[in-house]
């Protein structure tokens, strides 16, 4: 929290030697996140904003992973997770300039591995501005 406001961020962390499928999971998650981020603009619905990221996931054979069942973004402000707007496949919420959201992509292979990329962003007329300052790739140890 900062002056009563909350933020939200997440990174997948690879620990140890990363096999090809785990690397693909990490790479695809980041690519989908970047595609989704580049599409965010004021005036679009949450469903429209959801499309770009999920095109990457579909192309790579991963299912739509709606973070905690709500979509690939949620509002953030006084609370880390507020009700609206939602960015997801069924959302008709409208993104508004200078609105703050947490934009996230989650990928899971149950029983094997999972990862997430998430930043707190401000919706700007020319594209989103990330307020998160943390590396996107985190490898603690590799042989």
Predicted regions span which residues?
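Active-site neighborhoods and metal-handling regions in enzymes and metal-associated proteins
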Residues: 1-143
């Amino acid at each position: 929290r900062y002056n009563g406001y909350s933020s939200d961020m997440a990174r997948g962390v690879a620990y140890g030697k990363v096999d090809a499928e785990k690397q693909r999971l990490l790479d695809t998650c980041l690519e989908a996140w970047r595609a989704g981020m580049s599409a965010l603009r004021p005036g679009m619905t949450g469903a429209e904003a959801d499309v770009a990221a999920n095109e990457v996931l579909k192309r790579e054979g991963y299912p739509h992973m709606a973070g905690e069942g709500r979509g690939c973004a949620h509002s953030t402000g006084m609370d880390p997770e507020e009700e609206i707007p939602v960015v997801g496949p069924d959302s008709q919420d409208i993104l508004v300039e200078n609105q703050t959201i947490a934009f996230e992509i989650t990928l899971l292979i149950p029983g094997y591995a999972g990862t997430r990329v998430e930043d707190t962003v401000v919706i700007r007329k020319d594209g989103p501005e990330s307020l998160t300052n943390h590396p996107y790739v985190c490898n603690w140890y590799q042989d």
